Regions:
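Boundary/linker segments flanking structured domains
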Residues: 1-35, 41-145
Length: 145
């Protein structure tokens, strides 16, 4: 079973500053509206969020929205408890499973990502400060298809 430990941040900028060099990371921007689920560690993202979201793009997003921090828009980072044993396929499967969990709530219009073409057949345990749409799958219940 794969275990993902979640940490909640006030916003994406705070998450970015703290974890920009972490590899094999799942992240969620937003919780109930305008939600994006992504990951780093695969597809050339071995450098973490700092490679995916180069500093100039983070700064430009502040200019676009006219704010240093998103209003009422938390961000979450999910790190793997045993990242040495986690493969690129594991990272992508966990990302897809989290996307499915959000879409199953019926909030498809709030998703800023495309629906995955398949639901991964893996078991994942979530612990820590999980996004609200994953709480029923946290600690002990796991998630599988």
């Amino acid at each position: 079973m794969t275990t993902v430990n979640w940490e909640r941040f006030e916003n994406f900028f705070t998450l970015y500053e703290k974890l920009k060099s972490v590899q094999k990371l799942i992240y969620v921007i937003g919780e109930t509206h305008h939600v994006y689920v992504g990951s780093v560690g695969c597809k050339g993202g071995e450098g973490g969020l700092a490679v995916r979201y180069q500093p100039q793009y983070v700064e430009r997003s502040k200019a676009i929205f006219g704010s240093d921090s998103p209003q009422e828009q938390p961000a979450f980072a999910g790190t793997f408890t045993n990242s040495n044993g986690v493969t690129c396929e594991n990272v992508e499967d966990v990302e897809k499973l989290i996307q499915w969990a959000f879409l199953e709530r019926g909030d498809r219009k709030q998703a800023l990502f495309k629906r995955p073409n398949r639901r991964p057949n893996i078991k994942v345990e979530y612990c820590g400060d999980v996004p609200s749409f994953l709480r029923d799958k946290a600690r002990g219940l796991g998630a599988s298809s």
